[in-house]
Amino acid sequence: MLEDFLKVMPLMTASGISILLILVEAATKNARITRLFAILGFLLVFLSLPFSPSEPDFAFSNMLQSGGFFTYTATVFSIGGLLITLISDKYLEMEDAHHGEYYIILFMAVVGMMLMSAAANLTILFIGLELMSIALYVLAGIMRDDQRSNEAAIKYFLLGAFASGIFLYGIALIYGATGTLYIPQISDHLAKNGFDTLFLSGIALLMIGLLFKVAAVPFHQWSPDVYEGSPTVATAFMATGAKAAALSSMILVGISIAPILETFTAWPTAIAMIATLTMFFGNIAALIQTNLKRMFAYSSIAHAGYMLIGIATGTDSGYAGVLYYIFLYTLMNIGAFGIIILVEQKHQFSELADYEGFFSRAPLLAFLMAMFMFSLAGIPPFGGFIAKYNVFSAAVQADMTWLAVAGVIASAVSVSYYLRVVIAMFMKDTKKQKLNPDPTATATIALVAFLVLLFGIYPSLLIEYTQHALAFAMK
């Protein structure tokens, strides 16, 4: 039993911290103290990462898998959770929503994400998905007195519950077709017996559930309204953590259905078409937005399309590209949303007009925001360029050159609305007073920007890690 705990130590640590936070909040009823324990908890999770073996192995009656893949994804989820925790407090206090349970729910969402990437059984994958989803529904409505927040939570819950039902039905069909819920055995069954219509129906429904979480077209309708209405700190976490967890699960599923990819070409073609529609719809819709949160919602849809390119290839290089992308996207998006959090006023929208002359109000924040915009647009030397290059080159290597070309065109379209933000900040005047942003949040965002630049100049620092993680994923 102790050996099993050590194999998935980050998950066990995060689960234990979640319970501890409940006790801390119940005893102190002080959100600041709960936040401090949450920060220490994430640091403990980081310290537990070396205990997880790099070689693939199984724990708890083969229900969970450990190894480099789990360690990498757990690192991404924990970094995202820690960054959100560091930049949340002042915003929540401003919105009269600084409740200790916010940090508890945030930690539980991270536990759900870790379960998804550690799942060796489809039942565990579903439990992780639901734990993450329910936590995100609550985070969307954490501003109890704000009608927009409540509306966002209800919309997310209703559509999310429907998607979860589809996901669960897919699991049932897969079990009916293969006789197992154990992911490696599904792969073995397909290799020996091939696949039938029942299995294809099941895997399609399962993928629809995951595509909903990444907000891919045509399962994206919820995201603009939910992202705009939710507290900005919750939006930042939804747009990054949920996507990273769902894409990690897609990689695990993709590895298990590898025999299909060799004989059933309609499968990668379908994913490629969804990726193409997602990229172009997200970018074109973002062009006409004047609200930054809504613009980033559509931008998030577009980035889901870029990452789906790597999934569509079905190759190790494609999956490694996705792993690199989810890490950089987590940094870029949380960094950009972090600046929105610092600028936002109580109960007000984040309009593009609010950023006119932003450089004269907060030069450092304007400079950092420009870095994030350039990186999200895929402009070198920032990490976003390398992230896109990796998935595009993987598509070319997989003889899907048309998909890579579509990605390049879609990325070129995105430059327009990202540059609109930069132009508004640096080339327009304002009479608004200077900002005095929270120093802790500013330092956190500056560190994130540094990492985005570092991984753009020295991508090998992270690429080797992603390749190692994939090499030691469950095969």
From Swiss-Prot:
Provide a GO biological process annotation. ATP synthesis coupled electron transport
Example GO CC term: the record gives: plasma membrane
> Membrane spanning segments where?
8-28, 36-56, 67-87, 100-120, 122-142, 157-177, 199-219, 244-264, 268-288, 295-315, 322-342, 366-386, 403-423, 443-463
* Entry EC no(s): 7.1.1.-
Tell me one Pfam family matched here: Proton_antipo_M
The entry lists its GO molecular-function terms as: NADH dehydrogenase (ubiquinone) activity; NADH:ubiquinone reductase (non-electrogenic) activity; quinone binding
Reactions that this protein is recorded to catalyse: a quinone + NADH + 5 H(+)(in) = a quinol + NAD(+) + 4 H(+)(out)
Indicate where this protein is primarily found: membrane
Q: How does it sit in the membrane?
A: Multi-pass membrane protein
Tell me the InterPro entries matching this sequence.
NADH-Q_OxRdtase_suN/2 (IPR010096), ND/Mrp_TM (IPR001750)
Tell me the domain of life: Bacteria
List UniProt keywords, sorted A-Z. Cell inner membrane, Cell membrane, Membrane, NAD, Quinone, Translocase, Transmembrane, Transmembrane helix, Transport
Subcellular localization(s) per the UniProt record:
Cell inner membrane
Give the EC class as a word. translocase
- Function of the protein: NDH-1 shuttles electrons from NADH, via FMN and iron-sulfur (Fe-S) centers, to quinones in the respiratory chain. The immediate electron acceptor for the enzyme in this species is believed to be a menaquinone. Couples the redox reaction to proton translocation (for every two electrons transferred, four hydrogen ions are translocated across the cytoplasmic membrane), and thus conserves the redox energy in a proton gradient.
Record text on subunit structure and interactions: NDH-1 is composed of 14 different subunits. Subunits NuoA, H, J, K, L, M, N constitute the membrane sector of the complex.
PANTHER family per the UniProt record, alphabetical: NADH DEHYDROGENASE
Q: Which family does it belong to?
A: Belongs to the complex I subunit 2 family.
HAMAP family in the record, alphabetically?
NDH1_NuoN_1
- The protein in question is named NADH-quinone oxidoreductase subunit N 1
